Amino acid sequence: MSLIVDVYAREILDSRGNPTVEVDVTLEDGTLGRAAVPSGASTGAYEAVELRDKDTARYFGKGVKTAVAFVNGEIAEALMGIDATDQVGIDSAMIELDGTPNKSRLGANAILGVSLAVAKAAAEATGQPLYRYVGGTSARVLPVPMMNIINGGEHADNPIDIQEFMIMPVSADSIAEAVRMGAEVFHTLKKELSAAGLSTGIGDEGGFAPNLSSTRDALDFVLKAIEKAGYTPGEDIYLALDCAATEYFEDGRYEMKGEGKTLTPEANVDYLEALVNDYPILSIEDGCSEDDWEGWALLTERLGDRVQLVGDDLFVTNPARLAEGIQKGCANSLLVKVNQIGTLTETLSAVDLAHRNRMTCVMSHRSGETEDATIADLAVATNCGQIKTGSLARSDRLAKYNQLIRIEDELGETAIYAGRSILR
């Protein structure tokens, strides 16, 4: 039996210098599982609640000592002596202990830290890597990365409205080769931006944050970098966008202030369709606001057979929100962020629901990350086939790419890189 004998949380810092929760779970044989919780900048209104202290005299109110205290108190007491391999039972016990629909009492950051640390401890105790423990013997598909190389929106201090401009190296034969391709484009883009007299400072997720004039300006720079790196856009490498449209949706209109545009929901769909017509865009995330169900339905009707339409703020990794979206014909892909829902069990339920409804899934980081690489294992465990974990800079992003390379190496000849199989 892999019985829990200690649950201990501490306050550490994330990649933006803000406090977050780290949890250690120790089993009776001495096995330790450790997990650190990420945090988002552009957060959906329907996400599980991240508990902050709100003590302005400390970390400007962003401390997590309250969440830490809940882990070290109520949660630890409730889980002591429970078998760590009972993930569903443990997650259910924490949800019941919290007693709210959005984990607002104990905090999703407290609950998730424990949930992931339990899984990692159980995997270690059973002598399995995390991806195999969670995903079983079929867990061998390495995901195509969405590499965020230009940042805008809430992730950068520039006038670009769209939050992320990403590249997807689909022609690679392995995750190691995909990372190499991405790195080569990243370094080429840096040279191109520098030659144009633009900033090569990086944003929260490691992408560049130049003072570009428009979405198309950013896309043109990315295309040029792909070509100069020796690759063919739309063949070797595709483009992906995260609009994070909720961030600029005001009073029923899309206020793209960086470009001086005010768009109705229908005009917003027209805008995105024009981009798809002119650029090799494979995926668009949050092209409409989380509350614009009609806009989402129209976008899916117009582009759903050509482009992957990913729901992030729309679904917040919540099976109930996802079921509503499926019923309304909105989006065809689920972005998976473990801290949006707050437990591993609920995350896996959302992925299963998406797959059963023939939707794709994209495992994702948050803009506030740590060196914890759990999502790399989860991307393989769930056979997502795609992962968003930032650019080719910042160790908090590279930790995930490096873990994927290790997993691929460990799987050997049985490893499969998703590659072109994700194309629509």
Curated annotation (Swiss-Prot):
One of its GO terms (cellular component) is cell surface. Keywords: Cytoplasm, Glycolysis, Lyase, Magnesium, Metal-binding, Secreted. It holds the Pfam family Enolase_C. It is an enzyme of class 4 (lyase). (2R)-2-phosphoglycerate binds at Q163, K337, R366, S367, K388. Binds a second Mg(2+) ion via substrate during catalysis. It comes from the Bacteria. Its EC number is 4.2.1.11. Mg(2+) binds at D242, E285, D312. GO terms for biological process: glycolytic process. Signal peptide: none annotated. Catalyzes the reversible conversion of 2-phosphoglycerate (2-PG) into phosphoenolpyruvate (PEP). It is essential for the degradation of carbohydrates via glycolysis. Belongs to the enolase family. NCBIfam families: eno. This is Enolase.
